[in-house]
A protein has these predicted regions:
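Signature of long, low-cysteine stretches enriched in small and polar/charged residues
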Residues: 112-155
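Solvent-exposed loop/turn segments at secondary-structure junctions
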Residues: 104-106, 140-142, 154-155, 162-167
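A short acidic-to-branched-hydrophobic micro-motif
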Residues: 85-109
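N-terminal targeting sequences that direct proteins away from the cytosol to non-cytosolic compartments
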Residues: 2-12, 19-82, 160-184
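Short acidic-hydrophobic surface loop/beta-edge motif
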Residues: 43, 50-59, 86-90, 124-128, ...
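Short, surface-exposed coil-to-beta transition loops
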Residues: 37, 82-83, 94, 110, ...
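Short hydrophobic/aromatic-rich beta-strand segments that constitute the beta-sheet cores
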Residues: 72, 99, 135, 156-159
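Glycine-centered tight beta-turn/hairpin loop motif at sheet-sheet or coil-to-beta transitions
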Residues: 57-63, 91-96, 139-142, 153
Length: 184
């Protein structure tokens, strides 16, 4: 069993390295890097987790892959304007993925707000499964965030913590982010 996990980790490392090399090559050409689920993930990796459906509104939902070691955390007790629509974490609370939905007048305005009031830095464009998104860091809170537009006036914010964990978390985080797509 441990050998299978090592092989999977090695395969993920190779895929991530290939992705990073392609990102560096694309950056030199001033193109936007892309993450595509089908390019990054094998059936073996996919089997180590499951897709979760997230309701954005009555008529809109997305799916993302969550690894088996992360559990869904009840958010019903949370209240206020920044209540998450979903929260997943490891039992030891060392790693988590929190999803928020926000209504926005424009993506540029939301990015400016995250930079000014949200503590965001290192904003970069990235294409996730054909959708142009924005990634950024919130260094003071050790968060890597992704802004995923779900409509003209609504965004999904995916916050992955911690930002600076070990290589396995970095690989897992990239797999999670590459899995985001509209639910069918």
């Amino acid at each position: 069993m441990k050998t299978g996990k090592r092989i999977t980790a090695l395969l993920c490392s190779v895929l991530l390295l290939a992705f990073l090399v392609s990102c560096n090559t694309l950056a030199l050409a001033e193109e936007v890097p892309e993450l595509n689920w089908t390019d990054l993930v094998t059936e073996e990796i996919e089997a180590q987790g499951a897709f979760q459906k997230i309701e954005i509104s009555d008529s809109l939902s997305i799916q993302l892959w969550i690894p088996a070691e992360m559990i869904s955390v009840d958010t019903s007790f949370m209240d206020g304007p920044f209540k998450p629509v979903a929260l997943y974490g490891t039992e030891d609370q060392a790693r988590s993925v929190i999803l928020f939905v926000s209504e926005v007048s424009s993506l540029d305005e939301y990015v400016a707000l995250m930079e000014k009031e949200g503590g965001g830095s290192n904003f970069n464009s990235i294409i996730i499964n054909g959708v142009e998104c924005i990634s950024y860091d919130v260094e003071k809170d050790n968060i890597l965030s992704l802004i995923y537009p779900v409509s003209d006036h609504m965004v999904l914010s995916v916050n992955c913590m911690p930002m600076d964990a070990d290589e396995n978390w970095e690989i897992t985080r990239n797999i999670i982010l590459s899995s985001i797509h509209p639910a069918e």
